[in-house]
Amino acid sequence: MNWTLELVILPVSDVDRARDFYSKIGFDLDHDHVVSDEIRFVQMTPPGSACSIAFGKGLSESEPGSVKGLQVVVTDIDEAREQLLAAGVDPGEVDEQAWGHFVYFDDPDGNHWAVQYMPYRQN
């Protein structure tokens, strides 16, 4: 039996701003549903990923921006960096380590992401 990771909740302070940010960097919008006056559920998925992020109103008691250590894997770190730059997000220079090449960025609330290319994997 497989146990696949489906969803990671991100605490954000402004749902529309987060939705716009993640759309701008290429995430696909899966759902944006207002359940009630207290609950709004937005689900977005990075291109090619089986796991999504969700944020909204009434979904998390965590402090906005408190999620650290989120990571996505890409097949071309330079292309990913250029895509982020084109979206107005500065991921810094590529950090080349023996176990992978990385760029990093924060969403508008400070939730921290790593983008990794693993050169030892076949693409």
Model-predicted segments: where are they?
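Mid-chain, well-packed structural core segment of small domains
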Residues: 69-82
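Core segments of cupin and vicinal oxygen chelate
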Residues: 2-3, 9-51
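Vicinal oxygen chelate
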Residues: 7, 32-33, 40-43, 81-123
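Short, charged/polar, Gly/Pro-enriched secondary-structure boundary elements
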Residues: 49-53, 110-113
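Short, charged/polar surface micro-motifs in flexible loops or helix N-caps
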Residues: 47-51, 61-62, 76-79
